[in-house]
Amino acid sequence: MNGRDEALRGVPRFSLCLPACGREIAVEVLLLKPGVHVSIYDGDAPHIGAVAIIDPAGSLMVNEFPGHRDGVICRHWADRFNAERFHPAVIECGIHYDGITREGIQEVVSVTDDMLEVVVQRIASVLIEPNQS
């Protein structure tokens, strides 16, 4: 077992994949003590296009890299996590589909909204009490 495997041993985590535009979007969640780390990615070129950070007090910051639009999804997830008091948290998103249409973008946003609902329910079921910092 390498050091990374050892470090993650015992950390609650789960993942979810749902289809969008002929591919799957993946979400991976790590429940840290305290904190939540979420990665949302896939499409034709999974990457990191935006990162949202919620500090322990609930202050929110979103950084979207130039040329990317992933901040919309990051902000939406971060706003919901903040409302649920799931902080501190880091949410990173990188979804890219070559030649995506406006309808395809709407499908990706809709699917990530559905995924958000599942993730919030899963986190709430694992946490005894959200961080009240």
Where do the model's predicted regions map?
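Conserved mixed alpha/beta catalytic, RNA-binding, or beta-rich assembly cores of soluble enzyme
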Residues: L8-E84, P88-Y97, R102-V126, N131-Q132
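A positional/architectural concept
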Residues: M1-N2
